[in-house]
Amino acid sequence: MSFRIASPILLPLVAMSMGMILNNVVQAGPADNIYSPIIDYREWEFELKGGIQDFGNRNRGELAYKFTFGYGIAPRWFSEIEVEYPRSPGNAARVEEIEWENIFQLTEHGEHWLDVGIFNEISHNRLQHKNFFAIGPMFQQETGRSQINLNILWKRQLSAVQEGDAGNSRNALSYAVQWKWNLRPAFQPGVQAFGSLGDPAHLRSQELKLGPAFFGAARLGNGRNLKYNAALLGGLTRETPNATLRFQLEYEFF
């Protein structure tokens, strides 16, 4: 079997293997999403992301929304500002985190068997008074109607360790992977998986959630598009929420 033919299977297998050997520090939120390394120059984007997980569980239940505004600054650079608005059982919803995210496209779309990019994020958690830096590669592989995306992210706490943080690592790894079948523009079935991984110095399996997803897009004319996706994810480890329902709406225009 050639490497080109095997590649649609290789990426998700690598991601799942990572989820089985790595440890979690901070769980992936219900409104998290998967990023593509492909950039549309001079395109504006407005996004609404949301999700709910185990809301009846006071320890790990959460309802969260993310509001995002972005622009394709250069042919290979897209930048956006994101605000996260979560709520846990028994608590009021509050703006928790403000994020500045950047996507850098490293390869020309379709010229190689694998499209590659770099994702970077600087964030401030205003409730915990902590700052974070995150960076990692993004991969996209297309064969026929099949498309696979893989994100791997290293995140580090920049602010000083606070009281109560003793024993917690300042570094964490996470990944997200999806497969979709481009059946038709309005509906594309697929699968998504998210894992929050842990300190690379102490590798142990902890969180992994996986489930069916669907994707779609509608052309609105005059360079305007509406994209959407949603997934129902089941927890595969004891530390993962039992069920997560997530969605993403994206309005694009030039």
Model regions: which residues?
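Transmembrane beta-barrel domains of Gram-negative outer membranes and organellar outer membranes
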Residues: 26-254
